[in-house]
Amino acid sequence: MTELKNDRYLRALLRQPVDVTPVWMMRQAGRYLPEYKATRAQAGDFMSLCKNAELACEVTLQPLRRYPLDAAILFSDILTVPDAMGLGLYFEAGEGPRFTSPVTCKADVDKLPIPDPEDELGYVMNAVRTIRRELKGEVPLIGFSGSPWTLATYMVEGGSSKAFTVIKKMMYADPQALHALLDKLAKSVTLYLNAQIKAGAQAVMIFDTWGGVLTGRDYQQFSLYYMHKIVDGLLRENDGRRVPVTLFTKGGGQWLEAMAETGCDALGLDWTTDIADARRRVGNKVALQGNMDPSMLYAPPARIEEEVATILAGFGHGEGHVFNLGHGIHQDVPPEHAGVFVEAVHRLSEQYHR
């Protein structure tokens, strides 16, 4: 077993005792940091940054040099899997990700390959191995993937969407085609996450960014069902240590009980869910991650500290809380405010772990 100097994040996910509440930030390696912007400029564009193991490692480590974070998260993108399926990912200025050949019907789905994670996605595994080597056991490394439903939204819509009418049309008019796509994605994601674990990821997270746009019944059938399949297929132990799995559905606060039934170790919460309520509902089954509104980082330091204190008090005493934002950090947040946030979590949480 590789020695970890700080395993607080892994312990909290497994609801084991910790000295203070661990903290990391979604998108902690990102555009709010001037050093990230410099490295991205050096890479040329976003996907070149993802595909260069040394540079992906550099941006993964940048926030850890600034803040006493309790975990590193692989620098990559959820769209690596659809890209490896040959959909032609590109980024349009101001528009975000686009695909040159979106999936429109069952025939398109049938043509999609299941990517080999050490081949088409080998650059991700190289990044994982490089980051693990450079972390030198300081903190654990989190691997991740998008959920099948969330990946499918981009693949069918051809990019980002506000109303999701194209994929919902497929869901209601041709559900078989969508289920075939989701099934292929679930297999691909399982292979992808297991390859990340074998390459050195010590925990994994499934981001279901768009699960919250579904009705409860559709969420069960088209999103949660496939995440459950992935959880069932994941390696749960590696290098002599349990590999915790976190599920995060943005806008999924009303479905926590069903999510906790999947056998995952933790649930991510967005900022619209009350953490005290979430703990009452599922805290005996899973750890909870979250859940400060990322926009709170625009507030003055004293207000940020007050919000941290409120969320810590909401969760209360005992184990099973990983502090995070309720979604990714915004790109124009002052880096010092992120520092205030991280420091406040450690300082103010000590009383809850005595």
Swiss-Prot record:
It is found in: Cytoplasm. The keyword Methyltransferase does not apply. The keyword NADP does not apply. Pathway: Porphyrin-containing compound metabolism; protoporphyrin-IX biosynthesis; coproporphyrinogen-III from 5-aminolevulinate: step 4/4. It comes from Escherichia coli (strain K12). It holds the Pfam family URO-D. This is Uroporphyrinogen decarboxylase. PANTHER family: METHYLTETRAHYDROFOLATE:HOMOCYSTEINE METHYLTRANSFERASE RELATED, UROPORPHYRINOGEN DECARBOXYLASE. Keywords: Cytoplasm, Decarboxylase, Lyase, Porphyrin biosynthesis. Catalyzes the decarboxylation of four acetate groups of uroporphyrinogen-III to yield coproporphyrinogen-III. Homodimer.
